[in-house]
Amino acid sequence: WEAGASLQPTLTMVAGNFSATAWGSVDFAATSYKEMDLTLAYALGPVTFSLADLYWEGGAGNRGTVSRSYFRFGADSPHRVEAGITWRISERVPLTLAWNTVLFGAADVNARGERAYATYAEASYPFAVKGVEMKAGIGIVPWNAVGTYGIDRDFYIQNIFLNAGKSWTVLGSLQ
C-alpha cells in the first residue's frame, strides 16, 4: 500500500487441510520497501485459521527505531505475529470475509505507547477472466497502531483493490 509497483512472489505448500506460505514483497522505487511473511494455516470447511510472522523493516520514517536484523526478536524487532480467520460464505456465493489481528511485535503500539492489537478486516469476491484468477475487494482498519499501518486512528478504509494472478503447478505430486 505504500510501496508502489512491486514484485510479490508467493510459494505455498499444501498437505491435507494444512498449508504453509512464504510471501515476499520488494518495490521498484527508492523507498526500498521489503516484507517477508511466513504463514501457517488450517482449513476447516469454509473457515481457515492462520498464524503469520510478518517481517517488515518499517517505512523510511521509522527505520531508526526498528531493527533491520531478521533474527532480532526484542523490543525493536521487525517481526509481528498475526492471527487470522477467513470465512468463504459458500461455493455458490464465494464472498470471503477475513479478520487479522497483530498479537505482538515492536510496531504494534499506538501513539501513547500502549499495545494496540492492530487489526485489518477484508471482504473480497473472487472471479476469473480468460483463465486469470481475479479478486476484488475492500479492506478496513477498525483500530490501529501507528507503527503497523502508518497512522494512529480508529476506523478507516485501508484499500480498495482488484488483483489478478496466474498459478502454475510446479510438482504435481510428491508421492
Q: Whereabouts are the PLM-identified features?
A:
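Outer-membrane beta-barrel transmembrane domain signature
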Residues: 4, 17, 88-175
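Short, exposed beta-strand/loop patches in secreted or surface proteins that constitute
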Residues: 11, 85, 125
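Outer-membrane pore/translocation modules
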Residues: 29-122, 149-155
